[in-house]
Each structure stands twice: as structure tokens, then as C-alpha cells.
């Protein structure tokens, strides 16, 4: 955002525990602030993922004018990185454009002190400084207004996808929403199997728990059950009028019954009942299966801009699951028994923040 003219350059410092309230107030006035800038998200990732939060504040005359939240990610497999923000699809610098250069310089300095060779910014004000690389063609976001009622929401789905959805709605599914122990157990059971089937290690169970605990009524789980068994489940975040189905998936049996389609349709209706007016389908890699799935639902992709900096002589970390170097490991992971994948996976997935 453009700020009023101010005398003097901003100063940057690292926030302490006493800055939380001021930072939260600052975010309230920032239209571009995402749920991943929220101090509740920052705390949940630190407590649930084990990555310390380093929040940089730019101030003028003692007033916060811009901020850059970072998580210090460290992994034996994937190396070190300062990420804005951990386990998120958004983040980056928020606030006054003129303060961005000072925050960028401070982030690079912090990376040097932490011996972290890489800084990753997932959105926000993009750096214009030597050594930074901006990508605007690798990921896309998907946001669409919610319809006025359930019937209109069904009609808003393109014809071909609507036919698939109707097949799912013909089954006797039970839809459950909440954030209690049973909801959490169903979600982890379904989600862990879903990502194993994709060849990806599951995140630590405590990460989901910390996010749900931190966000309270601004997060919940919706689960689709068939004959008492959970087939599809999604953990969603609610932020400024939008619902974001963030961690969702389905077991193998969900596909034939179209339980995933029913899950997203049910979430659209549930979110509207909660007062939301937009459905934020999150990001997907361009031309991936998820990318085309969202387009089939009528969502229009919007390019996302990410930036990264790597110290001289260092290689950027590679956590892209589509990278050729990981394809053999992905095929191997898909064959693991689920208990083994769930035991080992969280130790690996911590580094994928």
C-alpha cells in the first residue's frame, strides 16, 4: 500500500513478545495482509512445526509502517531457509512500499547471522534488490464469490463438473463439521492417507492441532462420512470474509463416490452460512492436477508472485515435489504401509515448511 509522506527513513528491528498487540493492530489496517501474516498462524507454526518465528518490524517515529514475518526453517534433508511464512502459501512484506528495501536488507542480514543461505517470500511487496529472483509463472491462486444459496451454488459449478458432483450427492453421505477430538481424528486419518497416496510425507499431527487451537472459531474441519466411515476431510481457515480449505484430501474409496466433490460443495454452503462471501481455493502449481481440478470448478487462475534470495555461492533449497530428483522417492513413498508413513513422515515434512 502507499503510505502518507513521512520524514526520515524507516528503522527495522526484530519484534519481541511485547510487540504482539501492536503488530496485530497494524495488520488490521492492511488490506493485503493474509491469514498467514496473522500472529496466530505464526505462533501455531512455531509451536506445531518447531520453526522459530522472527518478525521484522519497520517503524517511523515509533509507529509500525511495514512488517515481514519469517520462520527459520532447518532440516537435515532440505537445509536452512528463512521463509515467509512457514507451511503457508502466502506471506511476504506487508505495509508501506517505501519500507520494503529496509526489510529486505534486514532479512538478508538475519539470514547471514542464522547461517541460512536462502530467504523465501511467498507474496507481498516484491524485493527490487540485487540477488533476488522473482517467479510469476509457477503458481496460481483461485478465488471465487460464493453464490446466494445452495441451489445457486450448484448451478455455479460448470456443467461437466456439476454432473460429477450430482453423482456424489446421490449417495447417503453424512456431513460433519467441528474442531473437537473426533473431527481432528477423522481429519488426520483421511489426510495422512491422502498425502501418502500422493507420495508426500504428512505434516506433524501437532501442527494441525496448534492451528485449530490458535484460530478457535476461525478454523474448523468438515468431514464427509459414508456408512460411518470418513472418506474426505478438510481443515479450513476463515479470514476477512473468505473460507480457505487449506489441508484437505480423501481416502482411496472417496474417488469412486465423488466424496471430494461433495466435500468442497458442502464447504461452500457451510461457509456461506457462517457469513463468508468468498471461496479461496488456495494455490496450485501451474498445469498440475490440482490446478486443472480447480479450473474444472469454474475458478479462474490468478498468477502469484514469489521471490527468493540465495547467498553467494549457495544453491537454493529444492522442496518442489515435481522436481525430477524426487520422483523415485515419491513412488517409493506411495508403497509404504500407512503406519510407517505416518511414523516417519512428520520428521521429514517439518523441513517442507
Model-derived regions: residue spans:
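Non-catalytic accessory segments adjacent to catalytic cores
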Residues: 98-141
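Aromatic (often tryptophan-rich) hydrophobic motifs at membrane interfaces
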Residues: 57-61, 65, 88, 101-110, ...
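The substrate-binding groove and active-site-proximal loops of carbohydrate-active enzymes
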Residues: 90-96
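Active-site/acyl-donor-binding loops of N-acyltransferases
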Residues: 2-7, 72, 128-152, 276-353
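Conserved acyl-donor/pantetheine-binding loop and adjacent beta-alpha core of acyl/acetyltransferases
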Residues: 72-90
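A conserved beta-strand-loop-helix scaffold within acyl/acetyltransferase catalytic domains
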Residues: 8-61, 70-78, 123-139, 147-256
